[in-house]
Regions:
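N-terminal membrane-targeting hydrophobic helices
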Residues: 1-154
Length: 154
């Protein structure tokens, strides 16, 4: 759906960078978990593209519920507590970065749904805007660089 959401690649880079920020405080061995979960979390909110987009999955309640359910599902499937916790945390950060990216568009997001349908926004451009997408890329790359330098220094 053209014109409705940021480019997937911008969401992914921003999501991976955001999830790796919490990796600064974790052993390097968990980086791959954070990258995968950051990608999945950054894409998950757009599952509502065909039904109530930017409302149903673009809110704080679903951010919390889906992140918790992800962790519980992994535990149920037999993954370790540490793996489940790190995956859930990375998913949360990726998801949150998606909401932040869409917050920068003219349309905004319904952060408080189902309690309110008010669309919150810090409008700097459309979802197709080069500026908005470039900002997603740059912030994501900055976060990835911070992560890499933190691991080099330790």
């Amino acid at each position: 759906m053209a014109g409705v959401c940021l480019k997937r690649s911008a969401h992914i880079i921003f999501g991976v960078g955001s999830s790796l920020l919490i990796g600064i405080f974790m052993p390097l061995t968990y980086s791959f978990i954070l990258i995968i979960s950051g990608v999945l979390g950054s894409l998950f909110p757009d599952l509502d593209l065909r039904y109530r987009h930017r409302i149903l999955l673009h809110n704080i309640l679903m951010l919390i519920i889906s992140s918790m359910l992800t962790g519980f599902l992994l535990l149920y499937l037999g993954f370790s507590r540490i793996f489940s916790a790190y995956f859930s945390a990375g998913f949360f950060m990726g998801y949150m970065s998606h909401l932040m990216g869409d917050l920068l568009t003219y349309r905004g997001v319904a952060l408080l749904y189902p309690f309110s349908r008010k669309m919150f926004k810090i409008p700097i451009g459309s979802s197709e805007s080069t500026l908005v997408n470039l900002l997603g890329y740059l912030i994501g790359i900055l976060f990835i660089a911070i992560y890499i330098f933190s691991k080099i220094r330790s």
